Each structure stands twice: as structure tokens, then as C-alpha cells.
Amino acid sequence: MNAMLDPKVQTLLAVVETGSFTRAAAQLSLTQPAVSHHIAQLEQELDIRIFLREKGRLSLTREGKIVVRCAR
């Protein structure tokens, strides 16, 4: 992963790549609460919801897809 990326953006991309906050945490050597915190901070900074969390499934919102596309 690009070392120049903001840690919150790195976390977002890891969650998208792994499909899981827990797996992203393991990949990044973070705790799951730290991953959740990074995503919450990013959502607050951008004033959008990035993920929908329904019945144990994680999916990107329309706005989240745009953020991910720009981050890559």
C-alpha cells in the first residue's frame, strides 16, 4: 500500500479489499476498534456514510464507491 496515503484512506482501502473490518485490522496490524474509528473519522470529515452494514454484510454506499475510486 502507498505509504503516502492518509492512514484513514489506507484503512478504507484495506476494508474494501478484504471485505471485513476484522480482516483489514489484521492486514494493517491494527485492532478492529481502530479500523472502525478510522472509518468513522473519514465519514465525519467527508460528511457521508461510506458503508452500509446490514445483517452482517458490508457494502459501499454510492458516495463510498466514489471515495474509493478517487482514493485508488
Q: What function would you assign to each model-found segment?
A:
Residues 15-29:
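Short helix-boundary/capping micro-motifs
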Residues 27-28, 39, 46, 67:
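Core residues of bacterial helix-turn-helix
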Residues 1-3:
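Short, intrinsically disordered or compositionally biased N-terminal tails of bacterial proteins
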Residues 5-11, 32, 64, 71:
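The N-cap/first-turn positions of alpha helices
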